[in-house]
């Protein structure tokens, strides 16, 4: 147990989610619990991970989730390990939720040099309906940038995907290659623009971000056969697009071959995506979590053959393998499934709550009584009461005298 690698999970703690503050101590090695000396709360070592409060051995859960990431049918896992389908589904849901948080924290942090991005969508068969799953990738590093699942292939689906691409981008100057879907042009034009502040009243005008290149590969079919391919330059020039393709080594013309190859990887890893298969997905949330689980394993745990580099002289092996996350500079080693699923996601920094009302009078500081030229001196309380009673007596006596005179 390493307390220096842990952080406080208490949402009300001022030191929540912060590493290196030396506020974590070992509370119980037998129960694997830590304690925060800032707030005094204890928490388990598996808190905020898929293994939290599970009764089954961690090794068994890792094996089952690894098989699910490699396209193993659910019924095969049930027959091999004697588990219930609902148990496996619950583990998959936990791991998918953790994978989505992990992806948003490590990939969508604006640290990736994209260079060349490709996006595409594919349909998934479900119970009584089908879903559309749109995904994007950074071609030079083969990094999966994220995906969105929706029942409709519309502008909302593509806009959400494009927003994820912008969150991951470190520089806004890169090339985007997509298919002929018109929603891509509208989504990239809306998302990749910034307000131009002129100092005048009113909402500032939104201007397109310079440096973004967009090309479309439009395929014309006749029946089930591809008869013609049209390459269209939407943003930028053909010379600029060719220069980016040559610099990144990702082709000589506008293409979507890399994202289509990634689609094939996901089809082999997600059982419901197999063509002409019998497996179907039961809900949009299940597919989203499963997609993020496979995507995180692809980025951080799986070596990519096209990313290997020559090993330094003197090493036993000729090549050094890399994962997409290593090629993108997000990590320096290949993660295991245990590391991926055991990595908790830190909470955002604690912010002191704002007081929305005045303090009670017993907690307020006494305020000085303001003086004026007409009343320069404020009498003490007793003197004020005496003066008030004297003025009242004078007023009553004058009223009596006036009544007697009348």
Q: Where does each model-flagged region fall?
A:
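Residue-level recognition of single "structural anchor" positions
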Residues: 1-406
């Amino acid at each position: 147990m390493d307390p220096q690698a842990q952080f406080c999970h208490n949402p009300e703690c001022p030191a929540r989610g912060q590493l290196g503050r030396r506020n974590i101590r070992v509370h119980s090695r037998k129960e694997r619990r830590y304690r925060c000396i800032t707030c005094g709360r204890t928490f388990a070592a598996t808190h905020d991970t898929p293994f939290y409060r599970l009764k089954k051995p961690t090794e068994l859960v890792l094996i089952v989730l690894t098989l699910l990431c490699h396209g193993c049918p659910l019924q095969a896992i049930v027959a091999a390990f004697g588990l219930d389908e609902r148990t496996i589904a619950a583990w998959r849901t936990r791991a998918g939720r953790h994978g989505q948080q992990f992806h948003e924290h490590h990939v969508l942090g604006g640290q990736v040099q994209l260079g060349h991005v490709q996006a595409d969508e594919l349909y998934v068969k479900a119970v009584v309906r089908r879903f559309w799953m749109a995904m994007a990738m950074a071609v030079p590093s083969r990094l999966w940038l994220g995906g969105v699942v929706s029942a409709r292939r519309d502008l909302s689906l593509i806009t959400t995907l494009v927003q994820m691409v912008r969150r991951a981008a470190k520089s806004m100057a890169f090339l985007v290659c997509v298919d002929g879907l018109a929603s891509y042009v509208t989504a990239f034009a809306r998302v990749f623009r910034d307000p131009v502040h002129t100092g005048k009243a009113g909402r500032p005008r939104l201007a397109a971000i310079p440096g973004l290149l967009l090309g479309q590969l439009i395929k014309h079919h006749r029946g089930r056969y591809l008869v013609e391919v049209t390459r269209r330059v939407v943003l930028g020039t053909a010379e600029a697009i060719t220069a980016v393709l040559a610099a990144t080594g990702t082709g000589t013309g506008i293409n979507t071959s890399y994202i289509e190859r990634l689609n094939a990887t996901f089809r082999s890893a997600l059982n419901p995506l197999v063509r002409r298969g019998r497996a179907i997905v039961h809900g949009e949330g299940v597919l989203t979590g499963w997609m993020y689980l496979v995507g995180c394993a692809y980025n951080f745990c799986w070596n990519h053959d096209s990313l290997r580099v020559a090993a330094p002289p003197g090493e036993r092996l000729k090549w050094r393998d890399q994962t997409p996350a290593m090629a993108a500079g997000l990590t320096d080693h290949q993660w295991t499934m245990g590391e991926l699923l055991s990595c908790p996601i830190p909470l955002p920094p604690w912010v002191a709550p704002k007081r929305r009302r005045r303090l009670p009078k017993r907690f307020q500081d006494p305020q000085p009584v303001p003086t004026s030229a007409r009343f320069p001196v404020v009498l003490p309380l007793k003197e004020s009461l005496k003066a008030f009673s004297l003025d009242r007596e004078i007023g009553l006596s004058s009223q009596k005298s006036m009544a007697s005179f009348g």
